[in-house]
Curated annotation (Swiss-Prot):
The gene is TFG. Residues 10-91 form the PB1 domain. It comes from Homo sapiens (Human). This is Protein TFG. It comes from the Eukaryota. Residues 120-160, 187-400 are annotated as: Disordered. It is linked to A chromosomal aberration involving TFG is found in papillary thyroid carcinomas (PTCs). Translocation t(1;3)(q21;q11) with NTRK1. The TFG sequence is fused to the 3'-end of NTRK1 generating the TRKT3 (TRK-T3) fusion transcript. Neuropathy, hereditary motor and sensory, Okinawa type: A neurodegenerative disorder characterized by young adult onset of proximal muscle weakness and atrophy, muscle cramps, and fasciculations, with later onset of distal sensory impairment. The disorder is slowly progressive and clinically resembles amyotrophic lateral sclerosis. One of its GO terms (biological process) is COPII vesicle coating. The modification Omega-N-methylarginine is found at R385, R400.
Amino acid sequence: MNGQLDLSGKLIIKAQLGEDIRRIPIHNEDITYDELVLMMQRVFRGKLLSNDEVTIKYKDEDGDLITIFDSSDLSFAIQCSRILKLTLFVNGQPRPLESSQVKYLRRELIELRNKVNRLLDSLEPPGEPGPSTNIPENDTVDGREEKSASDSSGKQSTQVMAASMSAFDPLKNQDEINKNVMSAFGLTDDQVSGPPSAPAEDRSGTPDSIASSSSAAHPPGVQPQQPPYTGAQTQAGQIEGQMYQQYQQQAGYGAQQPQAPPQQPQQYGIQYSASYSQQTGPQQPQQFQGYGQQPTSQAPAPAFSGQPQQLPAQPPQQYQASNYPAQTYTAQTSQPTNYTVAPASQPGMAPSQPGAYQPRPGFTSLPGSTMTPPPSGPNPYARNRPPFGQGYTQPGPGYR
């Protein structure tokens, strides 16, 4: 003998469990199915347990896997081939079969692909149609819940995207930018849209400043009118520019008037119109006379109510709030002190006569300028005004 085993005519079993392959020679061909299972448990010790469910399949001449259920199937397999190729399946898992693992992995990848497609479709904007995908019928409840959650998150993301896009829109955001700029400088809409306030009082008596301010204060479409006594205002603004502030301090309102220059046109316009529309005739002579005698006890408003006695006849529209700028009132504030009223012993003289026009003592006129009294004429603002020297009444509460 040559020392080699004579395997001719004997049964050889090749068992495979996963990647582990064993070759076993069988001397007793009358082996049963239970003995074969016990043999496999001893061969693959540690991999097969007594309580594991083991399925044994053999490969025929065509390469197909045939299941062995009992001893008759095992004897028939032994007759077909002397080399019995067995494949073990433990607990139904296709670990030994590579093709079964590929199928299992392929099915898992298909499910993952469907989930990814559903998430991508939920993130698409609602206006654009997303790509249509065929969802298999064996979807679980968890997949549907994930789909609804992803749809809600997609809608929220589109809303946030739309809000961020509108924040950078220059046309829609222009009003907010203007409001932020005005609030940063401490301005309001009325101050920005309204006309600019009157500047300083040093140019209040000059004709060019009066013309420019009156044209700026008039609304479009209304003819601006020059106030009377241009020459007198020019002289008063040039000579008594310094005495104006002293007179304001003596009268008791000089500390309040310079603090609020934007409100001058509105305050004087209301007081001026109220003095001609609400007060009666006997009040104006009293105000004019009291202003010449006691300049420190009167408010600045009687100067405007008493002034029209010396003015020529002009339409009443020039004394409205929108047609009379603030510079005209500042220049006329010191004018009533330049003239003295006729004494009360002359009740027969009408208020429109120029006999009471006298310059104030100490008033020096400029060279080249003549002081001419205003032309006489009916006063359009007098409403049955009695002559001087009679009893007077105090102004109403709406005057101040």
